[in-house]
Amino acid sequence: MLRLLFKRFLNVVKWFAIASVLLVLLFRVVPPPFTALMVERKVESWFDGEPIDLQRSWVPWDEISDDLKVAVMAGEDQRFPQHWGFDFGAIQAAIQHNERGGSIRGASTLSQQVSKNLFLWAGRSYLRKGLEAWFTGLIEVLWPKQRILEVYLNSVEWDEGVFGAEAAARHHFGVSAKGLSRQQASYLAAVLPNPRVWSASHPTAYVARRAAWIRQQMSQLGGDGYLVELNNARKAPWSD
């Protein structure tokens, strides 16, 4: 009996692995029509008795402001061009910070955020963390860095029911994703830790300070020139 159950379990794992690889390969070239987070927000609104209309318009890489691309990396994941989905230095720093008490600091890379927003449910469990690591590894191996950032910018939440750079730019500033200024891009990046509480168009003093810090980091990273590193700077994880 146990042997039969174990065999069935292995079959489930095998077919899940095959299906997830095929899905990730598909989304390398096809825009994801929706994400798990979008479904979650929609269902939440139904149960709350206040259904929302999701705002989202996919736009290709060239139709997104370079300032926004750099601002998001500056604010969320400065080592994005170099790592393979996991920033172990940031993880160690976050653990040390959290052990000292105070506010909880996360260390999720952009790749990890794409994995959980696109494929997974909210919550904290070992199963979810394991699946997040699996999907993160897949997209890092099967997608170029530019594609990971493109999907992130088109799927991240920027306000209640507002997903992606195009919808966010029009919702907050009345411009296209391509037309975002450096300052507007920094404000959008500044609210990403908590976009349902903070507003890019009506920033608190904290958000304004964080946006100013992000603009400073953008300059230190080299501005638009930092985008050149996206598909060239990464080394194999076993290399020196």
UniProtKB/Swiss-Prot annotation:
UniProt pathway annotation: Cell wall biogenesis; peptidoglycan biosynthesis
Pfam family, one: Transgly
BP-aspect Gene Ontology terms: cell wall organization; peptidoglycan biosynthetic process; regulation of cell shape
InterPro entries associated with the record: Glyco_trans_51, Lysozyme-like_dom_sf, PBP_transglycosylase, Pep_trsgly
Family designation: Belongs to the glycosyltransferase 51 family.
Keywords assigned by UniProt, alphabetized: Cell inner membrane, Cell membrane, Cell shape, Cell wall biogenesis/degradation, Glycosyltransferase, Membrane, Peptidoglycan synthesis, Transferase, Transmembrane, Transmembrane helix
GO terms assigned for molecular function: pentosyltransferase activity; peptidoglycan glycosyltransferase activity
The name this protein goes by in its record: Biosynthetic peptidoglycan transglycosylase
EC number(s) on file: 2.4.99.28
Segments passing through the bilayer: 9-31
Annotated function: Peptidoglycan polymerase that catalyzes glycan chain elongation from lipid-linked precursors.
Transmembrane helix in keyword set: yes
An annotated GO cellular component: plasma membrane
Cellular compartments annotated: Cell inner membrane
Keyword Metal-binding attached: no
Recorded topology in the membrane: Single-pass membrane protein
Reaction equation(s) it catalyzes: [GlcNAc-(1->4)-Mur2Ac(oyl-L-Ala-gamma-D-Glu-L-Lys-D-Ala-D-Ala)](n)-di-trans,octa-cis-undecaprenyl diphosphate + beta-D-GlcNAc-(1->4)-Mur2Ac(oyl-L-Ala-gamma-D-Glu-L-Lys-D-Ala-D-Ala)-di-trans,octa-cis-undecaprenyl diphosphate = [GlcNAc-(1->4)-Mur2Ac(oyl-L-Ala-gamma-D-Glu-L-Lys-D-Ala-D-Ala)](n+1)-di-trans,octa-cis-undecaprenyl diphosphate + di-trans,octa-cis-undecaprenyl diphosphate + H(+)
